[in-house]
């Protein structure tokens, strides 16, 4: 070869990079100038360390050699030999980045080192920095006096192979083998040439290359890699049996080779081979997916095997997996169209074929399948003919396409035979073509995967292969470059430069985009941080507010608790004061011996704890007294909020309740009612021989008062307030009562009592069970006060004793809500029955009948009793003087209310119209009882607890009235 020709060819690329070289040289000189002066001692020390490093490297001690080279560079940083030798050590250990840095430093010291430029290009090639590798190789060719260096061309061939310029790579590798047939990397070069020939379709040359290196494969590769390449080439040549045997050799050495399993599955799934076995094909493909589930080609072949086995659902799933991994593969979409065609989904098949044609319009099988679809679906023969013609143009040698095109052309030329021939082609064409023509796409599938497998699987292999290339770089070979003599080098260089520039631009754009993305991300992060901080501040503020609210609530709760405690303390103090007052009054008014003997029950009445049957009731009363200001004060206005019927009942039965009355004295009547319950049994035992109406009246009134003390009173705080007003208004009213009508009221009371005695016997049997029922149903009557009041038979039998005894019922009615009367009736009968057990049934009947008539007379007209009571109480007070002035006002007010009520009943005839004359027994009984009541009155007139107990005093008033009449 002409060296002059080589120089003329090299002039053009040299001229293009002269300026760059000059700039680099200037920089190198500037960098080298300050490092030149070294004192002799330093220089000699550096040389000594360099000698030590060379000796260690000769002995094979790389670590000590590297340490010595580092020491040399400390004393002489510009030692080119130390830099290059240390770089060679790093490159031998695959430390290409560190080696490249040292090579660059050596080139700054001496840019004329062509061998260093070549090795630097190889380092950049291993680092996948193709642009810098290309520039380094250019500098090596420029500085070399003889460019015929096999290692240099070996590196250039790898560079072109990485670029994808297979023709230039083939020329570079061929030049290496021409320069040195026994090149140390010859087997690697043959392997690379075999791959290049396979991609170029040069099957025989590829087989020669692979068979040549089969006994001794390149260092990073193994024998089964060569067998795999042989099988791939044989399969591409159509030698199915040889390909199967080659793949089986691979499986003998590597049972988990995913690509080999994939290819074997594809071979066993082909219907035109002798060893056709869909089940084996399925097994091999499933094993391949176990080894590498990310391979889209394996999923594609699996789908085709499922189609052969008519498992269309599994085939669809497999094709879906393949498309998910490689959505731009037209072969996948063609097979999906065939699947839709076989399950008669023609519209979907048309969409799949259309997409495959858009991705690659140069696949003949897709056009053939599209023609079959047109011909079968809607008998679109003209469209089918166009599709067949396009398929025939793309694949002239395809027999199926040519036969189908000829048959369809004959049909169109003979329109009369279209109907006859229409059935045959349509029946024959749809099934075979999609299945038969698809295997022809396999070579296209199997061309590129090998390169990708080698580049991905043997990255370290290529590095090791390149490492073995460079030790021989120092041995120049004097030979001519055939590539330059043929004139291929300028074109190669121009293309390489264009590609390098394009890559540089792409890299610059990518870097700019990366920077922009980084900035955008930084801004987004800053915004996110700001938002997070704002949210944190907001949360902190919300927490602070919540804490403040919680503290405020806690303080409010504490204040409420303190207020409640204060109220409770006040209530306790008031109760203590009341108890002290009661004790003082008891001490100031000692009873005489006769009164204590006759009325020992009244003493027990003030101390209810002495009587065992009544121990529990005072405790209940005290429990209700703990909240006199809260519950009763709140319940007072609730009486006006009741339904109209209940309000009418309240106004009729309790006329005095509508007048404003204080609430502080509410607990008093509860205790006093308890007291009178204890009075009744002892009266019966003291006067067991007397069967009078007064005893029945007293017993019923005491039971009524006991019922007012029942749990219904806490729910109605208003009734407990009425006795307080009765205390203040009773004394002037008693005198008026006696002055106005002393005789008429007594006569009416006695007449009524005698009439009830006659009718009592017939009613006793009916009244007692009613009373028992009312006792058992106390809770239900408490909830329904209106109903209980609407039953006159039961109420009349139970409530009259309150008013048959002196007219206490007028004021008691004001102190008892509508819901308390049914309760009064229930315990009345229950308490009367055990206390009167020693008496005869006649006494019970008289008592109950008297109570019944008096209750009816007083309950109907209570509203008009208040003015009459005032007059009667005033007259009675004048006559009785000192004795009656000290008596409780409520005890004197109730007889007046009963008399006035009876008077008005006679006038209006609303409830009962009975006029019966009194008997002698009744008159005597009234007199005796009046004496007893007078004695009790003197002992209880000043005590606050007895202000609401008018039963016995009323009896005494009745006796006094009778004596006055006599």
UniProtKB/Swiss-Prot annotation:
Annotated Gene Ontology cellular component terms: nucleus; transcription repressor complex
Residue stretches of biased makeup (Low complexity): 12-36, 637-666, 797-808, 826-843, 882-896
Keyword Secreted: no
Residues covered by region (Prion domain (PrD)): 467-682
Residues modified as Phosphothreonine: 475
Family: Belongs to the CYC8/SSN6 family.
Protein name: General transcriptional corepressor CYC8
Name of encoding gene: CYC8
